[in-house]
Amino acid sequence: MRDGEQTPGVALTKEKKLLIARALDEMKINVIEAGSAITSAGERESVRAVANAGLSAEICSYCRIVKTDVDHALECDVDSIHLVVPVSDLHIRTKIKKDRDTVRQIAADVTEYAKEHGLIVELSGEDSSRADLGFLKAVYSDGIDAGADRLCFCDTVGLLVPEKTTEIFRDLSSSLKAPISIHCHNDFGLATANTVAALAAGAKQAHVTINGLGERAGNASLEEVVMCLEWLYKYDTGIKHEQIYRTSRLVSRLTGIPVSPNKALVGGNAFTHEAGIHVHGLLADKATYEPMSPEYIGRQRQIVLGKHAGRSSITLALKEMGLEADDAQTEEIFNRVKQMGDQGKHVTDADLQIIAETVLDIYKEPLVKLEEFTIVSGNRVTPTASIKLNVKDKEIVQAGIGNGPVDAVINAIRRAVSSCAEDVILEEYHVDAVTGGTDALVEVRVKLSKEGKSITASGARTDIIMASVEAVMNGLNRLVRAE
């Protein structure tokens, strides 16, 4: 968690850290590095809160080779410290301006000090991949003699390659008398590969972050490393893998860092299919175009429609909507979807519903209808929205506040439909200006989910608030009708 929070722009409050720590603990993560106690009084309060939350995981604080860092960690009631020692000549000369012998002595002294105060110590070589291996081993050996429980090799700027990683870890794991961890950064996109290579060569622990968050290009991704081990190496990690996606979404929401659509396993497109030939294959056997079952990590596959969609995609989507179409009707729906795709339009579930109902000559009265809404916003006013909806022929009036007018009106809608759509989650919100100018047509696309079922919907108006309301209302009606 500490390295993930070092992602530029991320700052977690105590409450957010507790939410993430509890989610990690539920996943059966062994060690949670809750923060760096030396950072500030506020950080110490957060780390202490995590340490005293009654979690099963070992709670750890980052420390430099400075005794006051250890003292601050002790104030936070942590179980262990991640004691980081600069080991490359570059870091020793330029960062701490000392020599090798002095660094060895200080590292051993601080390790001994921490052990005397009852802490578990993981002694970590910062910039290990650019260090002299003989010197690194000497630092590790001194640490073991001083009582270090674990060691860690840090590829601080992501310079390792898997072949070199394997060579190094075979050497270290066979020559050192303490378990060794691997800590990889993703500067060249090799963090997961290097982490798995180290584990295969004898490393006993891996440092990872949810969604691969971290400084610069991030760290090794927890979900990628765990699933490589579980699915490719058939190794039981003990992690509750079915909670991976839910935890990924939680971390993304709390940090404000969106997950790239093509991110392995947890990205929006990881189990999403559009191309007709792929969907046709999936209908015959899901293994044709999926390396693993999405349910294994708590996900569902999704078929999306657009210019690459095939008839199989249309048939499957209609079936999921509970609609029956003959061959001629299916062909007409298929052609209309293709036409929208060729125009560059993103075809949402709600779009398909409208197309299908038009072709099939079906009209279904919306179960949730907008009667009216009002927004109050300004530079000295908390954005507030009041809304009147007709929900299954019952008039409901509600209000909501938010970080802006769009947030406020969506919160008001949530409250108004709580009786029939209590667990609806707004997973994604995307805005595009379709035309130019201050009176541009705005298209809003949303992704809503309820009890594992996800749908997409859109709204297009010159008013972004109206477009947002239209998109959410279209999505809500699809979800409510699906029940």
Curated annotation (Swiss-Prot):
Stated family: Belongs to the alpha-IPM synthase/homocitrate synthase family.
Q: What does this protein do?
A: Catalyzes the condensation of pyruvate and acetyl-coenzyme A to form (R)-citramalate.
Pathway named in the protein's UniProt entry: Amino-acid biosynthesis; L-isoleucine biosynthesis; 2-oxobutanoate from pyruvate: step 1/3
Q: Which SUPFAM superfamilies match?
A: 2-isopropylmalate synthase LeuA, allosteric (dimerisation) domain, Aldolase
InterPro entries for the chain: 2-isopropylmalate_synth_dimer, AIPM/Hcit_synth_CS, Aldolase_TIM, Citramalate_synthase_CimA, LEU1_arch, LeuA/HCS_post-cat, LeuA_allosteric_dom_sf, PYR_CT
GO BP term (any one): isoleucine biosynthetic process
- Cystine connections: none
Instruction: Report the catalytic activity.
Output: pyruvate + acetyl-CoA + H2O = (3R)-citramalate + CoA + H(+)
Q: Which Pfam family, an example, fits this chain?
A: HCS_D2
A GO molecular function term, named singly, is: 2-isopropylmalate synthase activity
Gene this chain is encoded by: cimA
Boundaries of each Pyruvate carboxyltransferase domain copy? 1-245
- Assembly and oligomerization: Homodimer.
- Reading the lineage from the top rank, the first entry is Archaea
- EC number, UniProt record: 2.3.3.21
Its name, as the record gives it, is Putative (R)-citramalate synthase CimA
Q: What class of enzyme is it?
A: transferase
Which organism does this record belong to?
A: Methanosarcina mazei (strain ATCC BAA-159 / DSM 3647 / Goe1 / Go1 / JCM 11833 / OCM 88) (Methanosarcina frisia)
HAMAP family the record matches:
CimA
Tell whether Transferase is among the UniProt keywords: yes
Q: Which UniProt keywords apply?
A: Amino-acid biosynthesis, Branched-chain amino acid biosynthesis, Isoleucine biosynthesis, Transferase
Which Gene3D superfamilies does the record associate with it?
A: 1.10.238.260, 3.30.160.270, Aldolase class I
Q: What is the lineage of its organism?
A: Archaea, Methanobacteriati, Methanobacteriota, Stenosarchaea group, Methanomicrobia
